[in-house]
Amino acid sequence: MKKIIICFIFVFSINVSFADATSELIDKIKNIHSMTANFNQKLIDGQTNNNLNSKGNMSLKKPQYFKWITTSPNNQEIVSNGTKLWIYDGDLDQLIIKKVSNDIAQFPYLILLSKNTNNINKLFTVTAQDNNSYILKPKNDQMIDSIKIKFTPNNQLEYLEISTSLNQFTKIEFNNVKTDVDISNTSFDFKAPQNTDIIDETKFA
């Protein structure tokens, strides 16, 4: 009987710990209403042993707007106004237009735009670490193994780490972070440069 009680207390304490970690993370994400930052991104492909470093700038505004601009080594822009998603490759002069998807596996930073942050509890098992960071383990997603979100002492986003089932690891470090800034909604509409090859997948969806 004593063993059963001890096991129950242990399991209960784990569940409480997960709940506390999830609540802490949700509170931090809720406090990010808008954000701009520069980023440095490192992709390590465990299958090919190739590394890819890139950098650029980003902005987001709840509940649905984000912009991700890579300036080096290639020119690429990913922009969404909540309805459409534009993926522009400046080197290829090509633009792909898609309907907005909530696919976190494709764009892990979408978790910061979650309209209903309580869904984090449904999608992930969250554990807190001592250095103001959180490990998210998907409950169903087969593509992502884990997401790590690290905050600074004043609760600004410091970095994201994403590990996938394809043995790929991505770390995105943020600097010059500004939160709760005034960003116009129209800045999240994309206008293609002249002579751009446009593939509009929304017409076939």
From Swiss-Prot:
Q: Does the keyword Signal apply?
A: yes
Q: Could you state one GO biological process linked to this protein? A: lipoprotein transport
PANTHER family, from UniProt?
OUTER-MEMBRANE LIPOPROTEIN CARRIER PROTEIN
Source taxonomy: Bacteria, Pseudomonadati, Pseudomonadota, Gammaproteobacteria, Thiotrichales
Keywords for the protein's UniProt record, in alphabetical order = Chaperone, Periplasm, Protein transport, Signal, Transport
Family, per entry: Belongs to the LolA family.
Instruction: List the InterPro entries hit by this protein, alphabetically.
Output: LolA/LolB/LppX, OM_lipoprot_carrier_LolA-like, OM_lipoprot_carrier_LolA_Pbac
Q: Which domain of life is it from?
A: Bacteria
Q: Which NCBIfam families match?
A: lolA
Role according to the record? Participates in the translocation of lipoproteins from the inner membrane to the outer membrane. Only forms a complex with a lipoprotein if the residue after the N-terminal Cys is not an aspartate (The Asp acts as a targeting signal to indicate that the lipoprotein should stay in the inner membrane).
Its annotated compartments are:
Periplasm
Lipid biosynthesis found in the keyword field: no
Quaternary structure (record) = Monomer.
Q: Which GO terms describe its cellular component?
A: outer membrane-bounded periplasmic space
Stated name of the protein: Outer-membrane lipoprotein carrier protein
- Signal peptide boundaries: 1-19
What is the organism field in this record?
Answer: Francisella tularensis subsp. tularensis (strain SCHU S4 / Schu 4)
